[in-house]
């Protein structure tokens, strides 16, 4: 088993994008042994011209990120968080370097405690 994580980052180093304004998501995969790697750079072209708070827009975002278990962004509103949650995706507002956040999330996941989130 592995987990896919969508990370909102403007610079590829820090988690610093607002979910509704994110231009791309860096997709990482965390393996059962705690190792992780970036597997994709997913563009948010589908967002162009859309309001980040529109319900249809949020549902599109959830569909595009459906293969991800978690979304790590600098900021996220309650509406976006709820739509992602309803689609089985845990959203977390995190302000840290990507590597640090992924290392901590990997430790959490391999401990088996992710089940408390569902």
Spans of features found by a protein language model:
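Non-catalytic interface/targeting segments
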Residues: 1-60, 67, 86, 94-118
